[in-house]
Amino acid sequence: MFAIVRTGGKQYRVAAGDKIAVEKIEGEAGDTVSLGDVLLAGDGGEVKDAKGLTVSAEIIAQTRGEKVIVFKKRRRHNYRRRNGHRQSLTLLRILAVGEARKAAPKKEAAPKEEAAPKAEAKAAAPAKEAAPKKEAAPKKAAAPKAEAAEKKPAARKAAPKKDA
């Protein structure tokens, strides 16, 4: 039996006993993870409904992929940048395909468990009743402004002296 699973933004065709390298999944060597995002399952030429199916896998090792050279250049500007990148990978051995989702493995592949408790905590916090708002005090009438002092004419500047 085979299955198409999605993990790390990529899709993999797996069967029991296969070894695959996927984007990093939290866990140590020997841990069992469950890949719950099964897109398609089948047996030979027969395609089955993938709802409720999971794929269980064992983590073989946490490793890093080959170095990829990232070279940037802008012609005629003397601009060259060379960087390397090594992607973190997890090597998995597929144990079983098509188990029911009720089986609880040691670790879950999806990190959605952490997001749920935070949402519940936020929902519990606004349960307190809001304090009643006080009525605004009535506005006082503005006091009339004192009449401005008598205006004086602007001082005149002395004329520049003439050279003889």
Swiss-Prot record:
InterPro entries: bL21-like (IPR028909), bL21-like_sf (IPR036164), Ribosomal_bL21 (IPR001787). Disulfide bonds: none annotated. Residues 101-121 have a biased composition (Basic and acidic residues). GO terms for molecular function: rRNA binding; structural constituent of ribosome. GO terms for biological process: translation. Residues 154-164 have a biased composition (Basic residues). Keywords: Ribonucleoprotein, Ribosomal protein, RNA-binding, rRNA-binding. Residues 101-164 are annotated as: Disordered. Pfam families: Ribosomal_L21p. GO terms for cellular component: cytoplasm; ribonucleoprotein complex; ribosome. Part of the 50S ribosomal subunit. Contacts protein L20. This protein binds to 23S rRNA in the presence of protein L20. Belongs to the bacterial ribosomal protein bL21 family. This is Large ribosomal subunit protein bL21. It comes from Sphingopyxis alaskensis (strain DSM 13593 / LMG 18877 / RB2256). The lineage of its organism: Bacteria, Pseudomonadati, Pseudomonadota, Alphaproteobacteria, Sphingomonadales.
